[in-house]
Curated annotation (Swiss-Prot):
It catalyses: Endonucleolytic cleavage to 5'-phosphomonoester. SUPFAM superfamilies: Ribonuclease H-like. A divalent metal cation binds at residues 64-65, 155. Residues 58-246 form the RNase H type-2 domain. Belongs to the RNase HII family. The gene is rnhB. It is found in: Cytoplasm. GO terms for molecular function: manganese ion binding; RNA binding; RNA-DNA hybrid ribonuclease activity. Pfam families: RNase_HII. Residues 19-38 are annotated as: Disordered. GO terms for biological process: DNA replication, removal of RNA primer; mismatch repair. This is Ribonuclease HII. Its cofactor is Mn(2+); Mg(2+).
Length: 266
């Protein structure tokens, strides 16, 4: 949302002429109450999935990732196929939910939907760059589903390499219910994993900031230097590495990845 004070709501989806595989939502000003600067945001819907189901196209998956921005830990991607008859209530973009609500919905999604999780390790991120590593993990998650979907909706601007049809939806975690479910699975899986990494590498506060570059984390990096779970080519990590390890260190090979794909942490 811009800082101009105008509020928007989704009107309808259109195909972006610049990127035919990408769906962009046309927007129009939404009414606001006088003197109010915040309005309720409509939750994601199941209409795209339902439209495909009516045409006989099923399974339909949504996929999303968590952890592009942190300085440490993997990118975690999830793919979810919701059961149209057992959709958990309250699904939304994981960023709009409290941690407790995410945990609650995580368990409900796992109990009612088909899902898969994939991990792109810091070593892969350093080798391939964060975007390519994220797209790789998203594709791995889709192909790890119990049944290959016939159509996939992915959050963002970029389609992923799959053997089925794929649409990229900008802001998809707030628009498409299956993507919202995937955002919850990815976020909770990654948060749980970072708490485990905090036990493996104490002192960095991974359990608190989940690897993001907050002051607590930057101070620990400066004090302790990078851990084996840090992304060695991210600028703050490079600076800390130069301070603690002045010699040039090689980037670990992808073959040594700690995480590839599998069940989410418990």
């Amino acid at each position: 949302m811009s800082g101009t004070g105008r509020q928007f709501r989704v009107a309808r989806a259109v195909i972006s002429p610049q990127h035919p595989g990408m769906i962009r939502d046309k927007e129009k000003p939404a009414p606001t109450k006088p003197g109010k600067g915040v309005i309720a945001v409509a939750p994601p819907s199941f209409r795209r999935e339902r439209a495909l189901l009516k045409r006989g196209v099923w399974p339909v998956a949504g996929c999303d990732e968590a952890g592009r921005g942190p300085l440490a830990g993997p990118v975690v991607a999830a793919a979810v196929v919701l059961d149209p008859k057992r959709i958990p209530k309250g699904l939304d973009d994981s960023k709009r939910l409290t941690a407790d609500k995410r945990e609650q919905l995580f368990e409900q999604i796992c109990a009612t939907a088909a899902f898969a999780v994939a991990y792109a390790s810091p070593a892969r991120i350093d080798r391939d760059n964060i975007l390519r590593a994220s797209l790789w993990a998203l594709a791995k998650a889709v192909h790890a589903l119990p049944e290959m979907p016939r159509h996939v909706f992915v959050d963002g601007r970029d389609k992923i390499a799959t053997s089925c049809d794929c649409d990229a939806v900008i802001g998809g975690d707030g628009l498409v219910l299956s993507i919202a479910a995937a955002s919850i699975i990815a976020k909770v899986s990654r948060d749980r994993l970072m708490c485990r990494l905090a036990e493996d590498c104490p002192g960095y506060g991974f359990e608190n900031h989940k690897g993001y570059g907050v002051p607590e984390h930057l101070a620990a990096l400066d004090r302790l230097g990078p851990s084996k779970h840090h992304r060695r080519l991210f600028a703050p990590v490079v600076a800390a590495r130069q301070k603690h390890q002045p010699e040039t260190a090689t980037v670990p090979a992808v073959a040594a990845d700690l995480f590839e794909f599998g069940a989410p942490p418990v």
